[in-house]
Amino acid sequence: KYHNPHFIGNRSVITHLMEWKYDDIGDECERFLGPYGYGGVQVSPVNEHAILDRRPWYERYQPVSYDIRTRSGDEQQFRRMVKRCNKAGVRIYVDIVLNHMTGAQSGKGTNGHHYDGNTLQYPGVPFGPNDFHGHESCPTQDLEIHDYTNPKEARNCRLSGLRDLKQQSEYVRQKQVDFLNHLIDIGVAGFRSDASTHQWPDDLRSIYSRLHNLNKEFFPENSQPFIYHETIYYGGNGINSNEYTSLGRIIEFRFYKEITNVFRGNNPLHWLKNFGTEWGLVPSGDALVMIDSHDLRVGHTGKLGFNINCFEGRLLKAATAFMLAWNYGVPRVMSSYFWNQIIKDGKDVNDWVGPPSDKNGNILSVHPNPDMTCNHEWICEHRWREIYNMVKFRMIAGQEPVHNWWDNGDYQIAFSRGNRAFIAINLQKNQQNLQQKLHTGLPAGTYCDIISGNLIDNKCTGKSIHVDKNGQADVYVGHDEFDAFVAYHIGARIVS
């Protein structure tokens, strides 16, 4: 029901433009995301939130009201962005925080509303003490979650001190329904549901059952919102991400975990031959997948040193390329900003650092440079050639199955997607090149490697490859090359 992302045409990839301003996202939809084939943007939470010391990124995950006003802009700017992006063929998915309000502090939110997390007063909604879980429903002494595998505790107690809303209450549900319907009426395509694991599936079902159909100005009649859930599997039998697959897709954390394990060199690459449901993952149609996220990059989920983020560009590009080449789930590409990563005792002491901003905390605008990089400290992974060209690869591969699998029994693999696209990856540990005559599945001709370059005016700015009449080619990926993979598709054929 809530599984369709409503991509336009054969677009198939979402990017998370973390903490970008709405005006900048609108520009990016028109100037880059639309033309380069991205299907949608996940935007950071849009509702009024707490203003915390030092302005950390996670203040956006501490709601104060459901008014649309954040550091990214106000409701008018948000509406304009949604319209511009839809027109450019790019959908908008809003990160929604329904599980809780703020932490214990009191103060003012980004739309000027006062709140008090100690007395549980949020007049901007309004919510009061009766709208939160207390000792009557949370089994722990301090109202905090300690045992994440106990459903009652994980869903009725406080996640890291955040005030836990009583979603069994009709009043609370209706306030949340009104907020989501307001966003739907503006023209969003759906939502990332934050902390779904900590909300009862039946409460979410009740809320979703009242959602409007998507706005007919941008979507076909009777379209339902796309919803994908942050479901972190804590082990134990208590909570299972499968409880949420009737409510939308789940963010399949096992995908990130298994792929990272392989690309870190803990498991051989050739194991990925049957990667997917046979590994215990949910069916492809129930999954949204990622390599990196706003949490993973700083170790708020997973482990630092294990997670792959923008500081390991070569590895991140290779793992992302596999994700985009493999026919599983809806992939999401992280787009982050620079922070000074300092790891002490397995923790990043700067894991709180917010987006590039001026001394008054105003987020700085993104102005891409002619070479596709971004200004200030915006990293813009979604603009890296290796990534945007793999977005195109996925578009061209469409629903074609994986064919022509080859591996060396270790850390070199290659496969095609039907007869439309082909990729080869070399992560061999002992400085070994991948040099092999392989079946590419491609029609005869000369192809431009879309990883080392682009095809511009029928000329390749990178390496090229010749495919013979049998679909075979001499494939080469040196162990010390800038990128650990090559990729070809029928849209990058050099016409002779």
UniProtKB/Swiss-Prot annotation:
Highest taxon listed in the record's lineage: Eukaryota
Organism listed in the record: Dermatophagoides pteronyssinus (European house dust mite)
InterPro entries: A-amylase/branching_C, A-amylase_C, Alpha_amylase, Glyco_hydro_13_cat_dom, Glyco_hydro_b, Glycoside_hydrolase_SF
Oxidoreductase recorded as keyword: no
pH dependence: Optimum pH is 6.4.
Cofactor remark: Binds 1 Ca(2+) ion per subunit.
Residues that hold Ca(2+) according to the record: N99, R155, D164, H198
Gene3D superfamilies: Glycosidases (3.20.20.80), Golgi alpha-mannosidase II (2.60.40.1180)
Reported regulation of activity: Inhibited by alpha-amylase inhibitors from wheat and rye. The most effective inhibitors are the wheat tetrameric alpha-amylase inhibitor (WTAI) and the rye dimeric alpha-amylase inhibitor (RDAI-1). Not inhibited by alpha-amylase inhibitor from barley.
Protein name: Alpha-amylase
Location relative to the cell: Secreted
Binding site for chloride: R192, R332
Entry's Gene Ontology BP terms: oligosaccharide catabolic process
Organism classification: Eukaryota, Metazoa, Ecdysozoa, Arthropoda, Chelicerata
Enzyme Commission designation: 3.2.1.1
Main location: secreted
